[in-house]
């Protein structure tokens, strides 16, 4: 029987670190995490309180405050230095954080798919991550027929290879995964060897904006929650299309901001401010909408373009990640992992806030390359 998670007792005081003078959503955090007790909290524009669970928490807060970096504003017009800086940050973030994620959540580094309103355990969350893969395949009408199923698959932004190995087993397919993180690529390959898949699955460090594959190589092009890291969304999509074989299916599951109304030219200032804070910690360039992706696909004459907002189906995910981080195992692993991971953990409540305010959308976009 598995041991129950150990949460910090209610007497432990947890304050909210306020980066750039912005208050995290205390009410949403409390509603999701009843085991946590917040200290008396009176919002001001100048306080920079920190988690006070450890004696050195002030040092942690000072380091976090010092690490607040400018938002990456990369528009794809040749800002090579900024792109390199962004990609270096992404690689280092995942080099540092992938181990703790695997230890607590397993080898699938993405949201789960849940029935709305359900209460789920950690085991259910891992099942939900597999369901996310299956729901995306179903939405894209990927066939299980032995004569029609994909035989060559690329996993763009593969993490530690959870999806790639799943596809290799499900379809008996050859799978290639790419990531910016050397740590992820090495771990993904080690897991493939451990599962006896080294002959069909391989991983390498590569840039999704310049994939190391020839034209038209893959029957299924898969991108699970990597598009949000791409500084040039059009170039990213063009590369997905380039490596896709004629008739191939392309699946993009990604974070987007809400679609703009016909009268809007941009998000509201407070919405953009929220996203900027998330960008700072997760090494994200400027966000785009689902409609922006669709326009790119239409401009490239892709067929059977479909889109859906699955935000309601991923609602339990971020509260669950916060809960797992606040178990003794999760918290001590987090503290050991490094500053980039700690910084990322501190903005998790902003993801909850962004979804609740309908600023953030969890989007799935699929299409087919013409024959």
UniProtKB/Swiss-Prot annotation:
<dbReference type="GO" id="GO:0008757">
    <property type="term" value="F:S-adenosylmethionine-dependent methyltransferase activity"/>
</dbReference>
<dbReference type="GO" id="GO:0009820">
    <property type="term" value="P:alkaloid metabolic process"/>
</dbReference>
<dbReference type="GO" id="GO:0009706">
    <property type="term" value="C:chloroplast inner membrane"/>
</dbReference>
<keyword id="KW-0489">Methyltransferase</keyword>
<dbReference type="Pfam" id="PF08241">
    <property type="entry name" value="Methyltransf_11"/>
</dbReference>
<keyword id="KW-0808">Transferase</keyword>
<keyword id="KW-0472">Membrane</keyword>
<feature type="region of interest" description="SAM motif III">
    <location>
        <begin position="243"/>
        <end position="252"/>
    </location>
</feature>
<comment type="subunit">
    <text>Homodimer.</text>
</comment>
<keyword id="KW-0949">S-adenosyl-L-methionine</keyword>
<protein>
    <recommendedName>
        <fullName>Gamma-tocopherol methyltransferase, chloroplastic</fullName>
        <ecNumber>2.1.1.-</ecNumber>
    </recommendedName>
</protein>
<keyword id="KW-0934">Plastid</keyword>
<keyword id="KW-0150">Chloroplast</keyword>
<keyword id="KW-0809">Transit peptide</keyword>
<dbReference type="InterPro" id="IPR029063">
    <property type="entry name" value="SAM-dependent_MTases_sf"/>
</dbReference>
<feature type="transit peptide" description="Chloroplast">
    <location>
        <begin position="1"/>
        <end position="65"/>
    </location>
</feature>
<dbReference type="GO" id="GO:0032259">
    <property type="term" value="P:methylation"/>
</dbReference>
<keyword id="KW-1001">Plastid inner membrane</keyword>
<dbReference type="InterPro" id="IPR013216">
    <property type="entry name" value="Methyltransf_11"/>
</dbReference>
<feature type="region of interest" description="SAM motif I">
    <location>
        <begin position="153"/>
        <end position="162"/>
    </location>
</feature>
<dbReference type="InterPro" id="IPR025774">
    <property type="entry name" value="MTs_g-TMT"/>
</dbReference>
<comment type="similarity">
    <text>Belongs to the class I-like SAM-binding methyltransferase superfamily. gTMT family.</text>
</comment>
<comment type="pathway">
    <text>Alkaloid biosynthesis; vindoline biosynthesis.</text>
</comment>
<feature type="region of interest" description="SAM motif II">
    <location>
        <begin position="216"/>
        <end position="224"/>
    </location>
</feature>
<comment type="function">
    <text>S-adenosyl-L-methionine-dependent N-methyltransferase involved in the biosynthesis of biologically active monoterpenoid indole alkaloids (MIAs) natural products including vindoline. Inactive with picrinine as substrate.</text>
</comment>
<keyword id="KW-0017">Alkaloid metabolism</keyword>
């Amino acid at each position: 029987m598995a041991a129950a998670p150990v949460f910090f007792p209610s007497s432990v005081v947890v304050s909210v670190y306020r980066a750039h003078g912005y208050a995290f959503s205390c009410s949403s955090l409390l509603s999701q995490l009843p085991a946590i007790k917040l200290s008396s909290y009176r919002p001001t524009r100048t306080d920079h309180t920190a988690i006070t669970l450890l004696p050195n928490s002030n040092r942690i807060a000072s380091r976090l405050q010092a690490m607040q970096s400018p938002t990456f504003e990369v528009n794809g017009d040749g800002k090579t230095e900024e792109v390199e800086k962004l990609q270096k940050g992404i690689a280092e973030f995942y080099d540092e954080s992938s181990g703790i994620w695997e230890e607590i959540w397993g080898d699938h580094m993405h949201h789960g798919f849940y029935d709305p309103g359900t209460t789920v355990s950690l085991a259910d969350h891992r099942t939900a991550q597999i369901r996310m893969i299956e729901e995306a395949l179903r939405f894209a009408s990927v066939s299980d027929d032995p004569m029609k199923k994909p035989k060559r698959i690329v996993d763009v932004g593969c993490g530690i290879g959870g999806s790639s190995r799943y596809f290799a087993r499900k379809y008996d397919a050859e799978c290639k995964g790419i990531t910016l993180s050397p740590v992820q690529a090495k771990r993904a390959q080690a897991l493939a060897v451990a599962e006896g898949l080294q002959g069909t699955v391989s991983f390498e460090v590569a840039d999704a904006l310049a994939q190391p594959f020839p034209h038209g190589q893959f029957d299924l092009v898969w991108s699970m929650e990597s598009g949000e890291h791409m500084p040039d969304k059009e170039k990213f999509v063009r590369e997905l299309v380039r490596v896709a074989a004629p008739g191939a299916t392309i699946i993009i599951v990604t974070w987007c901001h809400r679609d703009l109304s016909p009268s809007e030219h941009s998000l509201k200032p407070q919405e953009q401010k929220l996203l900027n804070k998330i960008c700072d910690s997760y090494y994200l360039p400027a966000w785009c909408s689902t409609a922006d992706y669709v326009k790119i696909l239409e401009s490239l004459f892709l067929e059977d373009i479909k889109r859906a907002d699955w935000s309601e189906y991923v609602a339990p995910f971020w509260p669950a990640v916060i809960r797992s981080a606040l178990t003794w195992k999760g918290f001590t692993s987090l503290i050991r992992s490094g500053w980039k991971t700690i910084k990322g953990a501190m903005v998790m409540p902003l993801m909850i806030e962004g979804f609740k305010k309908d600023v953030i959308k969890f989007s799935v976009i699929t299409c087919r390359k013409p024959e």
